[in-house]
Amino acid sequence: MDSAVALSVLGAGSYGTALAISLARQGQPVLLWGHDPQQVARLQQDRCNQEFLPDVPFPDSLQMTDDLAYAVSASRDLLVVVPSHVFGEVLLRIKPFMRPDTRVAWATKGLEPEHGRLLGDVAKEILGEQIPLAVLSGPTFARELAAGMPTAIAIAGTDEQFTSDMSALMHCGKSLRVYTNPDFIGLQIGGAVKNVIAIGAGLSDGLGFGANARTALITRGLVELQRLGLSLGADAKTFMGMAGLGDLVLTCTDNQSRNRRFGLALGQGKTVEQAMTEIGQVVEGYRNTKEVHVLAARQNVEMPICEQIYQILYQGKSAQDAALALLGRDQKGE
């Protein structure tokens, strides 16, 4: 890398902190930016993220700042880890401070609010076509990643050298394996749609439908994910990898997933507001559901599971009626 700071991680939530810890544990000088000065002060004082990852101390090479200009200018390479609904806003904020050689990656999973555009398209529009871009995606829970448990993810980008550099930087033979993938579109789609299907898996379990129903939902959800991705030019093989099947299975089957827990609460009779309060963190799938609905309509792609989840979250349909609507669809070949 070209600077003393190997990477600036922008976003001090659970996942951003976990990625920063994983990198810094290898001895890499990493800078973690948070937007809240009080939170950053607590991180600096406690040398851990008491709110999200209280059992994982920060490595010595991990430093924190609330100064965005410093964080952006301190490293050639930036890793943005913020909720999808503020992704564009954060890029607008960092643009004035970017170096001539800045390269931008993100681990945000989702689509542009309201319009349902890929985050890569948002980044190109804001930062320019010439900036090297990359996206990280795959089956990763923050707590396990931060604790150094074995994890594998995928990375794709617009610039082969940047993708290779980021993969080498993040790869750790003891805990984190990073696979490069040429499918920049597919990795973005996988990370957004799996959140919606995970809500559905939680709903199914909350309704008491059992393992058969959950597995059918995951399997057909993968078909919907692939269908949307192919309409945008993605590679079908991507959806059998880390950012497709891998992330989908993880998010749909483990209660560390906020999206699954959100759906579980809804299936047990809680309102959207009550379920959100119960989770206490951003549930990306809630917004992703509307965004996927918009994108699927624009692409003229049929996504019946995602559509029923949209109707539950945004049109007041009961989970029971949504299940009946899916089961009552016309018979067809697999």
UniProtKB/Swiss-Prot annotation:
Its EC number is 1.1.1.94. GO terms for molecular function: glycerol-3-phosphate dehydrogenase [NAD(P)+] activity; NAD binding. Coiled coil: none annotated. Gene3D superfamilies: N-(1-d-carboxylethyl)-l-norvaline Dehydrogenase, domain 2, NAD(P)-binding Rossmann-like Domain. Signal peptide: none annotated. Sn-glycerol 3-phosphate binds at residues 109, 138, 140, 194, 247, 257-259. GO terms for cellular component: cytosol. Catalyzes the reduction of the glycolytic intermediate dihydroxyacetone phosphate (DHAP) to sn-glycerol 3-phosphate (G3P), the key precursor for phospholipid synthesis. This is Glycerol-3-phosphate dehydrogenase [NAD(P)+]. It comes from Tolumonas auensis (strain DSM 9187 / NBRC 110442 / TA 4). The gene is gpsA.
